[in-house]
C-alpha cells in the first residue's frame, strides 16, 4: 500500500513542511513576547520555528489517522512563513559603519532604528501567521490530504 503519485508536483507533500498546529500556535504566541534586539535572539527564534517542521508522510507511510497537521507550503501560509524567515535575517544590515571599531553617533542611531524596524517586521509577520493559523488556513486532516494524494490499497485476494 502506498500513495498513488500521478504528478511530479505531488512529491512536495513528502517534504519536511508539516507542523503540529498547537505547537506552531504556541510558538507564535511565545515569539510575540520575545525581544529581538540581537541577531542571536533573532536566530534562536528563527531556529525554533524551523525545528517545528518535519515530514509526516512518505510514499509508503500514510498521513496520521487522527487530527490535523499544518502544511507550511500551502498557498496562504507559504508567503507568510517565507516573509517571517526573511525578517529574522538582519545580519549585515543592522549596522553599517565606516570604521567598525568606532561607529559615529549617526551610525549608532541608524543601527538602533534598523533594529527597531526589524523587531516590528518580525512581530508583524508572526501576527499575520498566527491570524491565518487561527482561521484554520493551511491545516489538513487525512481525508483532505488523500483527496490530493490518494492512498492505494492492495487488491483483495
UniProtKB/Swiss-Prot annotation:
Entries under Pfam families matching the protein: TMV_coat
Organism domain of life: Viruses
InterPro entries, sorted: TMV-like_coat (IPR001337), TMV-like_coat_sf (IPR036417)
GO cellular component: helical viral capsid
Residue(s) carrying N-acetylserine: 2
UniProt entry keywords in alphabetical sequence: Acetylation, Capsid protein, Helical capsid protein, Virion
Compartment(s) of residence: Virion
Any one Gene Ontology molecular-function term assigned to this protein's record: structural molecule activity
Family of this protein: Belongs to the virgaviridae capsid protein family.
Function as written in the Swiss-Prot or TrEMBL entry: Capsid protein self-assembles to form rod-shaped virions about 18 nm in diameter with a central canal enclosing the viral genomic RNA.
Protein name: Capsid protein
Organism: Ribgrass mosaic virus
Amino acid at each position: 500500500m502506498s500513495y498513488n503519485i500521478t504528478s511530479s508536483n505531488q512529491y512536495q507533500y513528502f517534504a519536511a513542511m508539516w507542523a503540529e498546529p498547537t505547537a506552531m500556535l504556541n510558538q507564535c504566541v511565545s515569539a510575540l513576547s520575545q525581544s529581538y534586539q540581537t541577531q542571536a535572539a533573532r536566530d534562536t527564534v528563527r531556529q525554533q520555528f524551523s525545528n517545528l517542521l518535519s515530514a509526516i508522510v512518505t510514499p509508503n507511510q500514510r498521513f496520521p489517522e487522527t487530527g490535523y497537521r499544518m502544511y507550511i507550503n500551502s498557498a496562504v501560509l507559504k508567503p507568510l512563513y517565507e516573509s517571517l524567515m526573511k525578517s529574522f535575517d538582519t545580519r549585515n544590515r543592522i549596522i553599517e559603519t565606516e570604521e567598525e571599531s568606532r561607529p559615529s553617533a549617526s551610525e549608532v542611531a541608524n543601527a538602533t532604528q534598523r533594529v527597531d524596524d526589524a523587531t516590528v517586521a518580525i512581530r508583524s509577520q508572526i501576527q499575520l501567521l498566527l491570524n491565518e493559523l487561527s482561521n484554520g488556513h493551511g491545516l489538513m486532516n487525512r481525508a483532505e490530504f488523500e483527496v490530493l494524494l490518494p492512498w492505494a490499497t492492495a487488491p483483495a485476494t
